[in-house]
Amino acid sequence: MKNKYDFKLVEEKRNEKWQKKGFFIAPKQTKKPFSIISPPPNVTGQLHLGHSWNAFIQDSLVRYHKLQGFDVLLLPSVDHAGIATQVKVEEDLAKKGIKKSDLKREEFIKKCYHWKEKQYLKIKEQWDKLGICYDFSKERFTLDQDAQIAVSDFFIKLWEKNLIYRGQKAINWDIKLQTAISNIEVINKPVEQKMYYLKYFLENSNEFLTVATTRIETISSDVALAINPKDKRYLHLVGKKVVHPLTKKLIIIIADSNVSSDFGSGIMKVSAHSILDFEIMEKHNLESKDCIDNYGNLNHEVPEFQGQNRFFARDLIAKKLEKEGFLAKIETVISNVGFSQRSDEIVEILKKPQWFVKMDELAKSLISHLNSKDKIKFYPKNFEKNLRKWFEKIHDWTISRQLWWGHRIPVWCKNDEFKVQIDSPGQGWIQDEDVLDTWFSSGISAFAFLGWPQNFDLIKSYFPTSLLVTGWDILFFWVARMYFSSLFIMKQKPFEKVLLHGLIRDEIGRKMSKSLGNGLDPMEIIEKYGSDTLRQALIFNSSPGKDIKFNIEKLNTAWNLNNKIWNIAKYIADLDTFFAKPDLIDLWMENKIYILKRQIVKNIKKYNFSVIGTEINNFIYGDFSSRYIELIKTRKNGFYARKLLRKVLIILHPFLPFLTDFLMEKIFKMEILEQKMPRIRQFKENQKVENILEIIDNLRTYREKFQISKKIILEYCIINDKFSNAEIDIINKLTFGKWLENKELVIKTKNFEIAIKVPEELKKEQKGRELKEIQFLKSEILRAEKILTNKGFLEKAPREKIDLERTKLEKLKEKLVFYEKK
């Protein structure tokens, strides 16, 4: 073995070996399963640190359970990522001078599949470097043939239960991507903008009402003014009419409980392009009129501004209203604006025909399950409350997307008639042009990836899956949808437990992103430090629900631990191996291994990986390296030490798979993944070994404190206890000491009194230091006496300061007497 840990030597082709040997191919039938369906990364780019963290957690848990005797399944998959992939492919085509509109739908889809294959190969290479134990015989793609059958079947089953409908409703519209998006794909951000205070004159009156709005561009779609029915200031105006500032038409004043009396003047203009406004219009039977088109431009409702960009038109409309006396004032405010998570474009609210999932019944089913004993266990627990709150206020889900790449909606149209089925009903029937929301297809992955609705072999063995590991940021996007979809189709929960981790941030707490330039490529880290080092740096700083502040120091710490394990293994491997029974030191060490294993088992159940990391670090640096290895240096036989090392390697394997596999193969000529988690005997705490260690620690501390060279033999004895010659021999060898009866200098430790004969060299040094101290004390006494005999000081200084100087002088004199007596 090399003198220094070389991760490239250790990790080279190791995952390839695991795959070839089929260590992680899950049997179709099992009585003791542990299964995880891995969150599918998008086929739009490379894996980032967050993907690596997630994959490492899953992999470590699967390896741990395999060593515990479970049949394990870690199922890999990738997501077609509808909007994101289509954008990437369009950008790629644009570089070649090709527009999407230049291609037929089938041609564009082929381009998308080609992109997917190219990207998937990159992702698989990255998984290989990470060392993830996927069962590639069962890999899935959210748009593969089986997935298409499953998604269509799911849609049809929802339709048959009247849980899917097509309706003309206010939806979130991404004007850049030209598609509808769901509510949770809208991200609110604080934006500085203008608040316009508009005058609405009462019919046949010089009196006016002031209405505050940030969206002056929607004024042409105003159909009413609304006040809160509890607002006494305006209640007498309900039913009256006001003059529209722009069109000069009359619009009515209504009362609605959704109006906030605290916002602006407490009067709200009811117009298109707001979900709340649409709800009020429906309730009061008011006709809605869009004034903004699909591209974010003003339409024909106001010919004067037709074709103008919605935001540019704000100033034009404001100037016109100011000129005509309808603008009271303008203020600058900070308010939340909805942005598309996909394109980062400001979302527009448009009324459009779309496909929706009715969520009331599905939400009630999920909440009911959360109230049962069979509910999914969330780690940390507070995310269950978050999920419950979200479902208590949920809206219907917009599932249609105006894209080409994705699952086609299984609906066929002919004139005004439509049919919901997978295959075409016949001649003249045209399939709906839209595709389904990506989360609609990934929302059934918990059971569809296991074969539903065509093959139930894996479902019988591995469903519900044991665990889902994912980031808390997709709790509502993905976890929630798998939950209610599984309850609807399978009549049971999709997984037993959900472990939610946080986000990876930089060392000052910022989210890693391309725009900030603070992102780190996991493959570059692996190239420099190795996969095991990156795994450690992420997993051993991981707690449920918590973010990680990542920095290079974490990598250095992890690499040092790997190097320490390497050095321990190399030392033990070089020892003689003739048979020998374990001595007290070996049994003491075995007990320490038992304690380590117990701590890992305890904390892995709670997914407290940071605690496991601390326990492993303390064990390796403390018990194994500084204690056990030091103690066995007094002998040359490593027969039992090798047995202990083998157990430690198996215990550490889930967290350091490459290194432990290499060492097991190199030293023991065995495959670590063919082993079982070792049974370790528990012994009573071996007090004799603890006593030896206590003496060694204190003698070493004494030597370090006074910087006594190892060339000088430290003479000592234990006053209040007896040690055997063999025990004294161990202490002597590890402290460069010698037993000598004396009572010169007595050190009291936790359990002992150690008498040390002070070396002559130290006495000389100590005498020199004492003489210097005496000289210093005399000069300080002289200074203090001079101050206290100074009349000016005594007359002007505060009493407290004078008393302080006198106290100081007394202490200096006492100290001088002490040193002069010595």
Swiss-Prot record:
Reaction(s) the record says it catalyses: tRNA(Val) + L-valine + ATP = L-valyl-tRNA(Val) + AMP + diphosphate
EC nos: 6.1.1.9
Enzyme category, top tier: ligase
Locus of motif 'HIGH' region: 41-51
Any one annotated GO CC term: cytosol
InterPro entries: aa-tRNA-synth_I_CS, aa-tRNA-synth_Ia, Anticodon_Ia_Val, M/V/L/I-tRNA-synth_anticd-bd, Rossmann-like_a/b/a_fold, tRNA-bd_arm, tRNAsynth_Ia_anticodon-bd, Val-tRNA_synth_C_sf
Subcellular location: Cytoplasm
GO terms assigned for molecular function: aminoacyl-tRNA deacylase activity; ATP binding; valine-tRNA ligase activity
Keyword Ligase belongs to the record: yes
Keywords assigned by UniProt, alphabetized: Aminoacyl-tRNA synthetase, ATP-binding, Coiled coil, Cytoplasm, Ligase, Nucleotide-binding, Protein biosynthesis
Pfam families for the chain: Anticodon_1, tRNA-synt_1
Subunit structure: Monomer.
Family named by the database record: Belongs to the class-I aminoacyl-tRNA synthetase family. ValS type 1 subfamily.
Name listed for the protein in its UniProt record: Valine--tRNA ligase
Designated gene of the protein: valS
